Amino acid sequence: MPEKINYENLKPSEARQLIREGVLTGPTAGIALGYTQANLVMLPKELAYDFLLFAFRNPKPCPILDVTDVGSPEPKGVAKGADLRTDIPKYRIYKKGVLEAEVNDIRDYWRDDFVAFLLGCSFTFEKALLENDIPVRHIEEGKNVPMYITNIETRPAGIFHGYMVVSMRPIPQNLVVRAVQVTSRFPSVHGAPVHIGDPKAIGIASLDKPDFGDPVEIKAGEVPVFWACGVTPQAVAMKSKPEIMITHSPGHMFITDLKDEMLAC
């Protein structure tokens, strides 16, 4: 991906256009800073209520920002005129729980019975962390945020069940409390951390081997801090095995027209 710094000040519509044209194909952290990014889950209508209930019961990993009309790829509530078939840098196609393909455009997979869910993403509060002089390591290193499948069980709904996925950011020990305070203001994009410290306590064997994304350096004096993550539905798909589920590829988000501060409380 071209240097992110050139894209920090893009308007969301400009970023989506570059994504649609295939200019931006990598992770979206640091792009159109100040605007809310979202995870995608796309399912047939017959499974949509089950997933809606799953998200309602699991608001930390699955905070809903918008739900499309059946058969419409336009998320009218958060980005009028956008097209969820083309405006995400990379998609994943799961069939019966198996990752079948990663693609840059899902028009060939589109069905008229699809319903799309957009879920809050922790990339949204990273601008607030940076403004409080709290480092965001994956942005510093030009990597995708590391994500891990935990032993934290989600509340099941219909066919959907499985374990929570978390994202991890190393935070200097003296800034951990401030990081909790800052992110607590954004409950619509995962909010406060779900765990601080020992990764083994939540079933993570090694921080060097994330299940999704890239490992990042943890420096002396830093503490791993874990936030609920919108990649959770992908781990759930692997266990629940729906006929088909289309998602974003981890770290490759949909950029909405919502300003981050609109979601702050």
From Swiss-Prot:
Its EC number is 4.2.1.-. PANTHER family: D-GLUTAMATE CYCLASE, MITOCHONDRIAL (PTHR32022:SF10). Keywords: Lyase. InterPro entries: D-Glu_cyclase, Putative_hydro-lyase, UPF0317. The lineage of its organism: Bacteria, Bacillati, Bacillota, Clostridia, Thermoanaerobacterales. It is an enzyme of class 4 (lyase). It comes from Thermoanaerobacter pseudethanolicus (strain ATCC 33223 / 39E). Gene3D superfamilies: PSTPO5379-like, PSTPO5379-like domain. One of its GO terms (molecular function) is lyase activity. This is Putative hydro-lyase Teth39_1160. Belongs to the D-glutamate cyclase family. Signal peptide: none annotated.
